[in-house]
């Protein structure tokens, strides 16, 4: 079966993302939602809104439970398919690591998708996607391969959302808007940054090679700040 469709309708659902689905049946242990071609999908009692009734449309996240059955939840996971996040390792076994992403079933990272052997209690930046063969939701710490190679259409001064990804000799690499790679230069960072931090930033420039230089202060504001200091010094000297 193919969960990779970008279209979400009554007959096409998206695994690892939120879907608007209709309540079609009430049972003792929850309600069933119309999953189109996939049949009815259970939303367990603990996630059913109090005033829920047949015919209502609910915004639910879909994933596979411990028995590989399609199941719905109204909880918001820490990452969805197609997104990047910094998550903590809950446990490991002979097959790989399992990350806490806010749902009952932990998110699997196979050994082949780990840059270094993941350790319990440590956090790692990952990308969540559907495995091509099993259609399970899995994660990869090899985030470079999931970043867009297209040239970003940003202009200088554009505000973006970033996830601090990696410390380098030049500064910090960041993932921009869940899609592109950018760089914050060490000499332009005036606060303490750590891998996994999420924040707003501004585009300083998109270089000829398509790489994005970032800055935490809106371009131009540093000049205003310099002018303010100069003016203050002038007033003090001439008071």
Residue spans for each PLM region:
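Long, low-complexity, charged/polar intrinsically disordered regions in eukaryotic proteins
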Residues: 172-223
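A low-complexity, Ser/Thr/Gly/Pro-enriched, surface-exposed linker/loop concept
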Residues: 53-71
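Short, small-residue-biased leader/transition segments that mark boundaries at the very start
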Residues: 2-9
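Intrinsically disordered, low-complexity linker/loop segments enriched in Gly/Pro
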Residues: 78-151, 165
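Structural detector for short beta-strands of small beta-barrel domains
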Residues: 13-27, 58-60, 81-94, 122-128, ...
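Beta-strand/loop nucleic-acid-binding surfaces
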Residues: 38-54, 105-117, 148-149, 180-193
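Strongly charged, low-complexity linkers/loops
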Residues: 213-239
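Short aromatic-glycine-enriched beta-strand elements
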Residues: 28-32, 95-98, 169-174, 211
């Amino acid at each position: 079966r193919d969960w990779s469709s970008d279209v979400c309708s009554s007959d096409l659902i998206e695994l690892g993302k939120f879907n608007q689905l209709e309540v079609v049946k009430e049972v003792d242990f929850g309600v069933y939602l119309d999953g189109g071609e996939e049949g009815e999908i259970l939303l367990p009692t603990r996630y059913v809104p109090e005033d829920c009734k047949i015919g209502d449309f609910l915004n639910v996240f879909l994933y596979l439970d411990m028995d590989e059955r399609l199941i719905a939840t109204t909880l918001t996971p820490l990452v969805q398919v197609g997104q990047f996040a910094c998550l903590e390792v809950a446990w490991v076994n002979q097959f790989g690591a399992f990350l806490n992403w806010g749902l009952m079933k932990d998110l699997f990272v196979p050994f082949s998708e780990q840059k270094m052997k993941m350790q319990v209690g440590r956090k790692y930046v990952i990308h969540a996607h559907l495995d091509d063969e099993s259609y399970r939701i899995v994660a990869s710490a090899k985030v470079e391969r999931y970043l867009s190679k297209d040239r970003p259409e940003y202009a200088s001064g554009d505000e973006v959302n970033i996830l601090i990804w990696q410390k380098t000799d030049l500064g910090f690499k960041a993932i921009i808007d869940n899609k592109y790679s950018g760089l914050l230069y060490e000499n332009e960072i005036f606060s303490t940054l750590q891998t996994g931090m999420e924040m707003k930033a501004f585009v300083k420039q998109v270089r000829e090679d398509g790489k994005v230089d970032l800055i935490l202060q809106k371009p131009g504001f540093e000049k205003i700040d310099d002018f303010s200091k100069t003016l203050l010094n002038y007033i003090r000297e001439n008071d």
